[in-house]
């Protein structure tokens, strides 16, 4: 949910209809319900005209969320769009499809589940809810253990990298858990496992590792984290577990790098979340959280309700929600199978390489994303003395592209990058077109007068006394310092986190 911040000015209180004026003569109030009804054609025209100013989802390279599905799946979605998922007694098949999806994902992530056993997991509205549920399970298990030992249980903490998505901050704030972040550094934009284990203490409910950083797409080293944390647990007698936030990478690593150990093959990994609406190839609104075993989900967190017709166990942060996302996920899993997902992910990775090569050939950017990871291309300007990545991002909108520019988290705030997310609907041709458009923009920006002297030193600002004798000290900032100053300004506008959506 985005909180409304629209300011209401007298001149903008009404909508003035264009083509809908055939049906409606009076201006339509913007922020109050109209007193009278209107023809359906007029309502459609008004809403449709408003939406024309939205960006093109296919050219929205900021988002990881799927923007295309096959027509057959669209039909299934429309036929089930009026089904409330929580009505399990009324729609038992939909519930069964969710259970099948949970088991498919549990096996994909190597959960220790036998062929005749049922995996433990639940469908959510996205990875944000999935992370909240996983975090609550860790917190409750930790509290129960501390209570049984007669120890304080009022100061839980969670260890993450500073590159985590904002939903982790929300979990910490909403559920009163201290967030201990491992700072980043230039050239290393993911959590350092050694530093993470170093700040683990007896109050740590879990360490969260990211399989596919939102910033660069890079996979964190979960295997090394497991090894180091196992050693510390043995030394201290603690039982600190690991959660893997595989929102983006959970549908990529199993198909492209099946030998990479990041999942339930590692003993300390107790839960994994993944976004079905990202590389699970489903429209927005579906995520999953899978637990290693029943013991990792405390029974007291599961509610049982019977007022919908039968006993229903439920563990969610919401209640009513659509069924179509679950149905669409099941469609994709059986439609594509392992082979199909592998082909889609290989194609995404191939298109990411095309874009990477094109950007590298320009000689203007440094690529900060990695070859192994989510198919994301993140790149920073080598020289920001004449213009910044924020200006490049803004100019790209003229061509229809939505490419975000943002700064890295602490302690790499002075690095600003552009990021392109390569989804299934981003083709080889689009990659080449984007490269061409970036080249055009750079040529235009090159004609602008320089903002700084060409000679700049990569140190602190140089102090210069004013010749006018006003007693004031004036500072000349070099290229790097000026870039940091610009970035600070953008950070004030954008807020603390610019990591996108789950």
Curated annotation (Swiss-Prot):
It catalyses: L-glutamate + H(+) = 4-aminobutanoate + CO2. Its EC number is 4.1.1.15. GO terms for molecular function: calmodulin binding; glutamate decarboxylase activity; pyridoxal phosphate binding. The keyword Lyase applies. Residues 471-502 are annotated as: Calmodulin-binding. Pfam families: Pyridoxal_deC. The modification N6-(pyridoxal phosphate)lysine is found at residue 278. GO terms for cellular component: cytosol. Keywords: Calmodulin-binding, Decarboxylase, Lyase, Pyridoxal phosphate. NCBIfam families: Glu-decarb-GAD. Belongs to the group II decarboxylase family. Catalyzes the production of GABA. The calmodulin-binding is calcium-dependent and it is proposed that this may, directly or indirectly, form a calcium regulated control of GABA biosynthesis. This is Glutamate decarboxylase.
């Amino acid at each position: 949910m985005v909180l409304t911040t629209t300011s209401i000015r007298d001149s903008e209180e009404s909508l003035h209809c264009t083509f809908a004026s055939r049906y409606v003569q009076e201006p339509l109030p913007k922020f109050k319900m109209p007193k009278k009804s209107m023809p359906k054609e007029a309502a459609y025209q008004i809403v449709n005209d408003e939406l024309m100013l939205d960006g093109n989802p296919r050219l929205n390279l900021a988002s990881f969320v799927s923007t295309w599905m096959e027509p057959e799946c669209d039909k299934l979605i429309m036929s089930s769009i009026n089904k409330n998922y929580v009505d399990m007694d009324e729609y038992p098949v939909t519930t069964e499809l969710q259970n099948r999806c949970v088991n498919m994902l549990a096996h994909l992530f190597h959960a220790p589940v036998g062929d005749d056993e049922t995996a433990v997991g639940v469908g959510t509205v996205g990875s944000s809810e999935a992370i909240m549920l996983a975090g609550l399970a860790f917190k409750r298990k930790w509290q129960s253990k501390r209570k049984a030992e007669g120890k304080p249980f009022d100061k839980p903490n969670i260890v993450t990298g500073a590159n985590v998505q904002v939903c982790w901050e929300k979990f910490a704030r909403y559920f009163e858990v201290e967030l201990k972040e491992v700072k980043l550094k230039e050239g290393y934009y993911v959590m350092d496992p050694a530093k993470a284990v170093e700040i683990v203490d007896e109050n740590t409910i879990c360490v969260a590792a990211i399989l596919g950083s939102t910033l660069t797409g890079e996979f964190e080293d979960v295997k090394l984290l497991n090894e180091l944390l196992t050693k510390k647990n043995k030394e201290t007698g603690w039982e600190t577990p690991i959660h893997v936030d595989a929102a983006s990478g959970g549908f990529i690593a199993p198909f492209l790098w099946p030998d990479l150990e990041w999942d339930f093959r590692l003993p300390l990994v107790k839960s994994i979340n993944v976004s079905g609406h990202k590389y699970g190839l489903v429209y927005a609104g579906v995520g999953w959280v899978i637990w290693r075993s029943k013991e990792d989900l405390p029974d007291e967190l599961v509610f049982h309700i019977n007022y919908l017709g039968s006993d229903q166990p439920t563990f969610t942060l919401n209640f009513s929600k659509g069924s179509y996302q679950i149905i669409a996920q099941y469609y994709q899993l059986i439609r594509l199978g392992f082979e199909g997902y592998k082909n889609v992910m290989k194609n995404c990775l191939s298109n990411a390489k095309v874009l990477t090569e094109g950007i590298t050939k320009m000689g203007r950017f440094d690529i900060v994303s990695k070859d192994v990871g989510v198919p994301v291309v993140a790149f920073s300007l080598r020289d920001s003395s004449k213009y910044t990545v924020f200006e490049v991002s803004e100019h790209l909108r003229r061509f229809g592209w939505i490419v975000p520019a943002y700064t890295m988290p602490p302690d790499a705030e002075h690095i600003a990058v552009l990021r392109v997310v390569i989804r299934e609907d981003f083709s080889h041709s689009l990659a080449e077109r984007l490269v061409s458009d970036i080249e055009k923009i750079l040529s235009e920006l090159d004609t602008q007068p320089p903002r700084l002297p060409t000679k700049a030193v990569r140190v602190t600002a140089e102090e210069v006394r004013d010749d006018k004798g006003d007693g004031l000290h004036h500072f000349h900032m070099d290229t790097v310092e000026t870039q940091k100053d610009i970035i600070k300004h953008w950070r004030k506008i954008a807020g603390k986190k610019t990591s996108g959506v789950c």
